[in-house]
């Protein structure tokens, strides 16, 4: 191969000389010399025609040899005209005497051989070539730098194992170190490099250098033939020696199916097409279920909807139609608290005690021009027009102590004014006759009945005597009402829908006389409340038994209507008052409770107020009883 490259270079040089003449000849020769040096580094020529060193080599670190070239005019020179001289440094100084090569024959033509007698390690050498007495080339080195071991010998291989498929096998290659290298004694340490390839291949596969003389080779195909070679180098050196002879490895075919391994299953193509198919299917699913996937990932924002109302009305701004629809449905109606006196929210203006002593709200709000009806604590006004019945349970009894229902009697406006005047007159008489009133029996406490308005009203009566006594105390003791405000009227409605109560009318201490002298006195017991729309049979019997059998006609007494099924409170009051005296029985003074908290919310239109904690007398619980009909009352009445 080297000869053919040399001939090709010469042919190119000849063709270039033919075109460019004699001027191109030196340049062509230089290029040819460079090409030869690249092809074979050992072949070095001197363009000037002078000899030059090619290499110096020590195979075992005991001897070494150097080689050189003759030059271009080699044939014109006589043999022995080129000589080699060397010099070495002993200890710290170089010797001044140049010595000639000891052996020109042992290493071959154009070489000089230094045996062990002339070789010293760790000592620098300098050599030079002379021709006809003149120096043509010079080089300096040490022996350990030029070590290139001989190739290993005795290569062989052994089979380690065969794969389960019978296609691949593992072998181990062994060799012997170079015979002239004293490896056993450790004078030199060698590293080995193994290379292998299939027959008819050009690229060798190199394995990592090892210090041992055996290397395993894995995954060799049984139906192939391989070439193996080994070379060595001194440890920590970069120059390898010559390759060993090539070892041919032929593995027998152990399995009849080994040839099928040539046909490899196209896993790579299957994976590629599989991924492509899955991608296409995924895109098809996404496009086919686009809306559903969009709703799952990004759910739509719900449109505000009201049941029974078209959303287009809200978009177009037709608020009048929307309000009309809302007014039709009961669920959308707003509760107008201003129409009803019974509310769930009450706001009270609590004044300081100093302000209360200076003057109460009643003194500031009430005057002669604004007369309002006095509200008895036992009865609450209700302008809603709806009836209500409150039956609070007492001590887990089956029936309430007092059944409270709405009354149906209607009293004319003049009668209401006269009743208010009678109450004022009664308060004045209680002040004048306070010493004599103390002797009055408790069983003869009067019960004042007053119809406040023409509207039907709910009557809320507690089952204890404290509530009744409180009502009488508020009427009979004007001094206790000096700084007490009765919140019974609505003065304002807040934006939140709550109402603010204002004080009602109270008795004035300056009134000493009254225009109307009608006094209604009931001889019934204290625990019998005449304000009830209905009453028990036992209480009616007690009341009738205590009343004198004298019938006095009064212009305020309404007659019983025979068509009524039940007896009203007004009828019973009138009948009982015909035989009563004109004097009002006094009652003991007690603190008046201030109803400022809500006890029970009966309905959106009604509530029950709680009284503040007051010392209460012993409670007398009434047994439950039924209602008295008209026929039964006629039989009882005298």
Curated annotation (Swiss-Prot):
GO terms for molecular function: cytokine binding; growth hormone receptor activity; peptide hormone binding. The soluble form (GHBP) is produced by phorbol ester-promoted proteolytic cleavage at the cell surface (shedding) by ADAM17/TACE. Shedding is inhibited by growth hormone (GH) binding to the receptor probably due to a conformational change in GHR rendering the receptor inaccessible to ADAM17. Residues 151-254 form the Fibronectin type-III domain. The modification Phosphotyrosine is found at residues 487, 595. One of its GO terms (biological process) is endocytosis. It is found in: Cell membrane. It is a single-pass type I membrane protein. GO terms for cellular component: cytosol; external side of plasma membrane; extracellular region; growth hormone receptor complex. Residues 1-18 form the signal peptide. A motif (Box 1 motif) lies at residues 297-305. It comes from the Eukaryota. A motif (WSXWS motif) lies at residues 240-244. Disulfide bonds join 56-66, 101-112, 126-140. The modification Phosphoserine is found at residue 341. Residues 294-379 are annotated as: Required for JAK2 binding. The keyword DNA repair does not apply. Belongs to the type I cytokine receptor family. Type 1 subfamily. On growth hormone (GH) binding, forms homodimers and binds JAK2 via a box 1-containing domain. This is Growth hormone receptor. It comes from Sus scrofa. The lineage of its organism: Eukaryota, Metazoa, Chordata, Craniata, Vertebrata.
């Amino acid at each position: 191969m080297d000869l053919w490259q040399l001939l090709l270079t010469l042919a190119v040089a000849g063709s270039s000389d033919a075109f460019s003449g004699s001027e191109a000849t030196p340049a062509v020769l230089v290029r040819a010399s460079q090409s030869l040096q690249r092809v074979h580094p050992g072949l070095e020529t001197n363009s000037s025609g002078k000899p030059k060193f090619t290499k110096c080599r020590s195979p075992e670190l005991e001897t070494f040899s150097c080689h050189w070239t003759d030059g271009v005019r080699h044939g014109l020179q006589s043999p022995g005209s080129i000589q080699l001289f060397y010099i070495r440094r002993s200890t710290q100084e170089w010797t001044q005497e140049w010595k000639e090569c000891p052996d020109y024959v042992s290493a071959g033509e154009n070489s000089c051989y230094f045996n062990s007698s002339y070789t010293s390690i760790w000592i620098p050498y300098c050599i030079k070539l002379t021709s006809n007495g003149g120096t043509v080339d010079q080089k300096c080195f040490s022996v350990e730098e030029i070590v290139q071991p001989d190739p290993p010998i005795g290569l062989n291989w052994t089979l380690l194992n065969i794969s389960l498929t019978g296609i691949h096998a593992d072998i181990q290659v062994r060799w012997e170190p170079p015979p002239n290298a004293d490896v056993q004694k450790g004078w030199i340490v060698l590293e080995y490099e193994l290379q292998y390839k299939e027959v008819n291949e050009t690229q060798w596969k190199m394995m990592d250098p090892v210090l041992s003389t055996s290397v395993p080779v894995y995954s060799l195909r049984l139906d192939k033939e391989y070439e193996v070679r080994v070379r060595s180098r001194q440890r920590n050196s970069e120059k390898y020696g010559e390759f060993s002879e090539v070892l041919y490895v032929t593995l027998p075919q152990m399995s009849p199916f080994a040839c099928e391994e040539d046909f490899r299953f196209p896993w790579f193509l299957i994976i590629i097409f599989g991924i492509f198919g899955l991608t296409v299917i995924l895109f098809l699913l996404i496009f086919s279920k686009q809306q559903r996937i969009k709703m799952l990932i990004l759910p739509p924002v719900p449109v505000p909807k009201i049941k029974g109302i078209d959303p287009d009305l809200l978009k177009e701004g037709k608020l009048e139609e929307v309000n009309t629809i809302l007014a039709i449905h009961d669920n959308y109606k707003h509760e107008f608290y201003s129409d009803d006196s019974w509310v769930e929210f009450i706001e009270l203006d609590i004044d300081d005690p100093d302000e209360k002593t200076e003057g109460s709200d009643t003194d500031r709000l009430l005057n002669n021009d604004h007369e309002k009806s006095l509200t008895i604590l036992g009865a609450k006004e209700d302008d809603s027009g709806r009836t209500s019945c409150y039956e609070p349970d007492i001590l887990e009894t089956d029936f309430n102590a007092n059944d409270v229902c709405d009354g149906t009697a209607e009293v004319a406006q003049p009668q209401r004014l006269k009743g208010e005047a009678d109450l004022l007159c009664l308060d004045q008489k209680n002040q004048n006759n306070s010493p004599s009133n103390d002797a009055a029996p408790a069983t003869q406490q009067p019960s004042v009945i007053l119809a406040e308005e023409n509207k039907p009203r709910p009557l809320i009566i507690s089952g204890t005597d404290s509530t009744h006594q409180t009502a009488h105390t508020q009427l009979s003791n004007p001094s206790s009402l000096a700084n007490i405000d009765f919140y019974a009227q609505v003065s304002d409605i807040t934006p939140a829908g709550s109402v603010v109560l204002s004080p009602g009318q109270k008795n004035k201490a300056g009134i000493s006389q009254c225009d109307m002298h009608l006094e209604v006195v009931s001889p019934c017991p204290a625990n019998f409340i005449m304000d009830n729309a209905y009453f028990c049979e036992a209480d009616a019997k007690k009341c009738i038994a205590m009343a004198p059998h004298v019938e006095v006609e009064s212009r305020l007494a309404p007659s019983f209507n025979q068509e009524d099924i039940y007896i009203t409170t007004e009828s019973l009051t009138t009948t009982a008052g015909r035989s009563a005296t004109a004097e009002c029985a006094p009652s003991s003074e007690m603190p008046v409770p201030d109803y400022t908290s809500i006890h029970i919310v009966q309905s959106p239109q009604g509530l029950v107020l709680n009284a503040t904690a007051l010392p209460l007398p012993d409670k007398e619980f009434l047994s439950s009883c039924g209602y008295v009909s008209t026929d039964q009352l006629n039989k009882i009445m005298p």
